[in-house]
Curated annotation (Swiss-Prot):
Role, per record: S-adenosyl-L-methionine-dependent methyltransferase that specifically methylates the N(3) position of uridine 2634 (m3U2634) in 25S rRNA.
Keywords for this protein: Methyltransferase, Nucleus, rRNA processing, S-adenosyl-L-methionine, Transferase
Family according to the record: Belongs to the class I-like SAM-binding methyltransferase superfamily. BMT5 family.
Transmembrane segments: none
Gene giving rise to this polypeptide: BMT5
Superkingdom assignment: Eukaryota
BP-aspect Gene Ontology terms: rRNA base methylation
Chain spans, region Disordered: 286-307
Protein's name in the database: 25S rRNA (uridine(2634)-N(3))-methyltransferase
Other facts: Present with 2960 molecules/cell in log phase SD medium.
GO cellular component: cytoplasm; nucleolus; nucleus
């Protein structure tokens, strides 16, 4: 083992030089160690900030999950004071050119009386964007309510009200927020049965409307392309089945009596399956006020304090049907 040098750094000769060299090396090492520590600290802080930023971004994105895509088409049923419609447009969740709004009420004047402080401003905002707005639309009689006929086709009706901006787009999503018949039935069992009828008929009529609108588009496209389904992979065709069915979306409060409505069973009876569900996050829809069906008053408990969910239903397609459709597509491709 080397003998430890003793003496003063200022000493002359070899001994002093060695002591000075040793002190210099130690100083350099201390500086390097300090620099490495600072660098590690800085990197750690930067990493923590990055992680925190990513977590906040993920949280924000998770909170912004919508039951529909921005570039898809959407019809809102049973709108009250039109605040939900306005919110999704203002928040850029949907293109105004892809939106249709319907109300069960008879007219603008009726809604002004029902929602005197909120409706008119929302209505004017949406009207200025040339969004087609329909009144007297019963979700249990959709085709009849729209007065669709051979001479008065869906596309004539919708383009007349949208300044011809709808074109021949398919309908991909039908949304009914917090369905309620507005009857205020006290007998709970009867109340449940009537709402089950409402939901069942809504499912049934939505499927009829999808089929009526979208099948024509698909058939016209197939005739134009001589049987080749060139539209199958386009954004507006992705969520449609071969028969033209899109998504049916319900929002509903948690708990009773809503759980007893058994909407999944009602959907199944219409050949629908639950694709997914997600929490209805009120904060994602600023300006939206869930109202009573017959007045501007809030429900007994403020809606924003109540848990609710979105339910997205789609037409059930068996694996064999999917396989047959894929096989047909592959066969057509091979025959080229």
């Amino acid at each position: 083992m080397a003998r430890k040098l003793k003496g003063k750094i200022g000493s002359k000769g070899l001994k002093g030089a060695l002591l000075r060299h040793k002190a210099k090396v130690k100083l350099v090492r201390n500086i390097e160690s300090k620099q490495k520590h600072e660098l590690r600290k800085k990197n750690s802080s930067a990493n923590n900030k990055t992680v925190k930023r990513n977590q906040e971004f993920q949280k924000l994105n998770q909170g912004k999950v919508m039951p529909f895509e921005k570039d898809e088409t959407l019809m809102l049923c049973g709108e009250g004071d039109f605040s939900f419609a306005r919110s999704i447009v203002e928040q850029n969740y949907i293109e105004s050119d892809n939106l249709i709004i319907t109300s069960y009420d008879n007219s603008v004047n009726e809604l002004k009386l029902k929602y005197p402080h909120t409706f008119e401003e929302n209505y004017q905002y949406l009207k200025d964007l040339n969004i087609p707005i329909f009144f007297q639309i019963d979700v249990t009689k959709l085709v009849k309510s729209f007065k669709i006929s051979k001479n008065n086709t869906w596309f004539k009706i919708i383009n007349r009200l949208s300044d011809h901006r709808w074109g021949n787009k398919p309908l991909q999503n039908i949304v009914f927020n917090f369905p309620h018949n507005g009857k205020g039935i006290k007998d709970q069992e009867r109340n449940i049965r009537e709402h089950q009828d409402l939901i069942f008929n809504f499912f049934q009529n939505s499927l009829q409307l999808f089929n009526l609108i979208n099948t024509k588009i698909q058939n016209d496209t197939l005739r134009y392309t001589q049987g080749y389904d060139l539209n199958e992979d386009t954004p507006q065709a992705k969520k449609l089945t071969a028969e033209g069915y899109g998504n049916i979306i319900l929002s509903l409060f948690d708990g009773e009596p809503y759980d007893s409505w058994q909407i999944k069973l009602l959907a199944k009876k219409n050949g629908l399956t639950l694709s997914r569900s997600s929490k209805f996050q009120w904060e994602n829809f600023p300006g939206y006020h869930h109202r009573r069906t017959n007045s501007e008053q809030d429900t007994t408990k403020p809606a924003k304090e109540r848990d609710a969910r979105f339910y997205i239903f789609s037409k059930y397609v068996s694996n064999s049907s999917k396989h047959n459709r894929k096989s047909k597509k592959d066969t057509d491709s091979d025959s080229d």
